């Protein structure tokens, strides 16, 4: 995980570290859609930006907190008779440790590995490859059609969507997953910290045991800069945003 110190656009929270996955896991091919989320919370509305709706059934759900995403995962586990992946701790939810086979958000490490995987021990820098410019129609980023609703756009890039696109609209990566680097950024399970356990191999890491904010992964329809477009970039937050959604994951055994 992480990026080299001299990589253009690198942030201080991207320290390189070794991770080992001993438990196999599944991950959603696409981000959770409004239609899927409204089966859990029928009244939810993802809103609008400018004159562009974010609320169509096939668009990714946004305007949700980390806790709402975690509650959706627990609800989905209940529908399938699986143990919950999150439990109450005071006024919040925390990941069960050791983690169950219930539905959950991907971990920070899982998300980055799946997003960057190229095979043969190689990890890609951007969703489309290792260099700029952005490959045409490779994902939904801040493009020319978004000039009226975002401050900065990618010059001469047009993905056809000013805001969110329908889930699964763009090409899949090497593992068959879509929109890991575009459309909406995504909540993951881990609490956010700047520093990492450098010098040791982390095995199936779930992140810190407590904190105030959670990690957000991936670029969104709002992003155009080299820092955010890279797959090693890490953001954080807790409250709802109109460019942050999520996808589901769970352990295979």
What are these regions (language model features)?
Residues 1-48, 60-77, 182, 248:
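A short glycine-rich, aromatic-capped structural motif
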Residues 16, 24, 213, 226, ...:
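Structural motif
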Residues 55, 66-234, 238:
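Functional-site microenvironments in short loops/helix caps that host divalent-cation chemistry
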Residues 13-19, 210, 238-240:
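A generic structural micro-feature
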Residues 52-60:
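Short coil/turn segments at secondary-structure junctions
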Residues 4, 24, 131, 221, ...:
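Short loop segments at secondary-structure junctions
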Residues 242-253:
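Short, structured beta-strand segments at or near domain termini in extracellular proteins/domains
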Residues 17-20, 52-53, 159-160:
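Short, flexible turn/loop "capping" segments at secondary-structure junctions
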